[in-house]
Amino acid sequence: MHETEIAAIEAREILDSRGRPTVEAEVILSCGAFGLAQVPSGASTGSFEAHELRDGDAQRYGGKGVLTAVTNIKDHIQPELVGLNALDQADIDQTMIDLDGSTNKSKLGANAILAVSLATAKAASEVLNLELYRYLGGPLANLLPVPLMNVINGGAHANNNVDIQEFMIVPHGADSFKEALRWGAEVFASLSQVLAAQNLLTGVGDEGGYAPNLASNQAALELLVEAIEKAGYQPGAQISLALDVAASEFYKDGQYTYDGAAHSPKELIDYLDGLASKYPIVSIEDPLHEEDWESWGNLTAQLGDRVQLVGDDLFVTNPIRLQKGIEQQSANSILIKLNQIGTLTETLETIDLAKRNSFTSIISHRSGETEDTTIADLAVATRAGQIKTGSLCRSERVAKYNRLLRIEDELGSQASYAGAVGLGPG
């Protein structure tokens, strides 16, 4: 047996950061090297995402158990992969895709397939004695991403009256990732003081951002500008803002309901254009419904030369959806979530397609996260230049930032911060 062959695969049901079950897999090679991976789970999910398999047994975890996915790994995936070379990631992933046989990984579960896919890459990097980012990215894996830090939550991520799902700070003006992280943490602390001074709640949402009850979406933007200035930084020049509108969540029958009233797509486009003119907004994610391709094209024509327009629910990390966006000139950026497509190989192919067509890529977490830090390595490996992994609190978020600090340290003088070399947003 060759030392890089897969000898066994373990799997178990664990908990994510919301206390809901998710899948963990361990791929063990014949030489004893192993890789461990946990998969995340989203709250606002796009309709076209790969299928997350849940048990549906109301007696366990309200039907959200993942024992079926775990069993699929042990009984179906393991027998097919044992004996295969862990260094051939594409072969491993294709074997699982073929075994599943469905268009959206609904037979075995994208959560089962992804856990094994990521654990395989980690086992392979260990047997080669390489860090994961170096194994996946080769000698050019030295670009640290600009973080888009979600510090105020609304929409589906919080129980408040703010329509926009995420308000982010983007410290692109820093010289290093370490400095960018410090800036973000200082603004987050400053925001806490600004909220407290206005008697607003400082409890946090799923991704560690504050979820105060605010009068409007503009009120959130005003708070962020104030917090940035209070921390001693310049809004726009050093730290900009980004939004995740998650517009599919407040879309019905061709209308968008926000600020207490229904609006047409054109009105929403003009509304966002107005916000981007008034505030230092460099990136807007999911500004329109995931099937409103025409409006996406109109928005991109109107705003695309000034603002990064990011497709998340629109593209769901799917190369076929992305190709349509490229052809129709809908958006100019894609959010990358491993569990939307379900294998590492397909994720890398989607990032490559984006890059070849001058779309930016943002590597992203999900609202239900784990201590797994794969996305930090993926951001560096692919030179994406941007990462979305939540706020500056909750250890499942901070784990990714801390991993990036270690990578930057390890790279030493070779490390380059995307914001400092003009490869981030802003």
From Swiss-Prot:
(2R)-2-phosphoglycerate binds at residues 165, 337, 366-367, 388. Its main location: cytoplasm. One of its GO terms (molecular function) is magnesium ion binding. Pfam families: Enolase_C, Enolase_N. It is found in: Cytoplasm; Secreted; Cell surface. Keywords: Cytoplasm, Glycolysis, Lyase, Magnesium, Metal-binding, Secreted. Binds a second Mg(2+) ion via substrate during catalysis. One of its GO terms (cellular component) is extracellular region. Its EC number is 4.2.1.11. Its cofactor is Mg(2+). It comes from the Bacteria. It catalyses: (2R)-2-phosphoglycerate = phosphoenolpyruvate + H2O. GO terms for biological process: glycolytic process. Mg(2+) binds at residues 244, 285, 312. InterPro entries: Enolase (IPR000941), Enolase-like_C_sf (IPR036849), Enolase-like_N (IPR029017), Enolase_C (IPR020810), Enolase_CS (IPR020809), Enolase_N (IPR020811). The active site is at 207 (proton donor), 337 (proton acceptor). Pathway: Carbohydrate degradation; glycolysis; pyruvate from D-glyceraldehyde 3-phosphate: step 4/5. Catalyzes the reversible conversion of 2-phosphoglycerate (2-PG) into phosphoenolpyruvate (PEP). It is essential for the degradation of carbohydrates via glycolysis. PANTHER family: ENOLASE. Belongs to the enolase family. This is Enolase. It comes from Acaryochloris marina (strain MBIC 11017). The lineage of its organism: Bacteria, Bacillati, Cyanobacteriota, Cyanophyceae, Acaryochloridales.
